A protein has these predicted regions:
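Asp-based, Mg2+/Mn2+-dependent phosphohydrolase catalytic module
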Residues: 2-30, 35-54, 64-89, 93-306
Length: 306
């Protein structure tokens, strides 16, 4: 585990690290680092190109409910050249693979009937190929599967909108029955074009408060980092993670024994007192926030820039 409270002074750009350290694999978060969900951050596309040109193996590691292929399509649509990436792994991809293979004892013991919490406005998640039966009655379910926070899936494949309060009432009934829950996106919130959205991790935290068992897929848990490093085909000591969430990206890097770069202008921007893009956070404020989350980056950078 890499968990040193010694944080370096904020850097000017990635070029400093590329020229002084020999990291073969760069594990990049997407939201808050490359883009805001709607458009790339200034300089992100050219920085990615420079990093790839320098010979880095770049792997997207994302707490997204969606499959890895969907994530790559989104990045392409935002203007990022797919050829710059070695691959991608998402929490949604891990969830899909685990439910499909069932080679882990925990997943092997699951039944086939589930309550499915998903998205509506953001686009529902397909369960095709998983041999699952979506049910609406908690009494008929074997487990709860949380891909989103906006809707409830139906046996027909359609979804109907639900409020957070309505979903939490379903969770109360599920916890009372002792159903396990799989959360396909551990993020609590995300920022999309400066608008905060509640994510499935919030439902999972509520479920744990109710006494329910939660299987957390994705960051900050080690499994997704191991998958990303395997895609790159390198050793952990040859990898560095880049992210804007202390709790997920930086904590996950600490737990996985790899170094990290904290992008301050993302999800923690307001907490750090930042008011504009590429504004530099004070080292003291970063240290205080890192201690609060018990997550310590190796390097600090205001934005993903060269």
């Amino acid at each position: 585990m890499i968990c040193s409270s010694q944080i370096s002074q904020p850097m000017n750009g990635l070029k400093d690290i590329v020229e002084t350290r020999n990291f073969k694999a760069w594990l990049l978060d997407q939201y808050g680092v490359l883009h805001d969900g709607k458009k790339p951050y200034p300089g992100a596309i050219s920085t990615l190109k420079n990093l790839a040109t320098a010979g880095a193996k770049i792997v997207i590691i994302s707490n997204s409910s969606r499959r890895a292929s969907t994530t790559m399509e989104k990045l392409k649509g935002l203007g990022f050249d797919p050829s710059f990436f070695t691959g991608a792994i998402t929490s949604g991809e891990l969830t899909h693979q685990s439910l499909q293979r069932r080679d882990d004892p925990w997943f092997a013991a699951l039944g086939r009937s589930c309550i499915h919490m998903t998205w509506n406005d953001r686009g529902a998640i397909s369960l095709e190929g998983l041999d699952l039966n979506v049910v609406e009655d908690v009494e008929e379910a074997d487990f709860v599967l949380a891909h989103g926070t906006e809707a409830l899936g139906h046996p027909s494949g359609c979804v109907s909108p639900r409020t957070l309060d309505e979903l939490e009432k379903i969770l109360e009934k599920s916890a009372a029955r002792g159903l396990p829950m799989i959360v396909a996106n551990p993020d609590y919130v995300t920022v999309e074009a400066n608008v905060f959205h509640i994510m499935p991790g919030t439902l999972a935290s509520k479920y744990e408060e109710l006494g329910g068992e939660v299987k957390w897929m994705g960051k900050p848990h080690k499994m997704i980092y191991e998958s990303a490093i395997a895609i790159a085909g390198v050793n952990p000591c040859e990898s560095i993670a880049v992210g804007d969430s202390l709790h997920h990206d930086i904590k996950g890097a600490n737990v996985s024994g790899i170094e990290s770069i904290f992008i301050t202008g993302g999800i923690h921007g307001n907490e750090l007192g930042l008011t504009s893009f590429d504004e530099t956070a004070s080292l003291d404020s970063v240290k205080t926030l890192s201690a609060k989350h018990n997550a310590f980056p190796t390097y600090v950078l205001s934005a993903f820039k060269w």
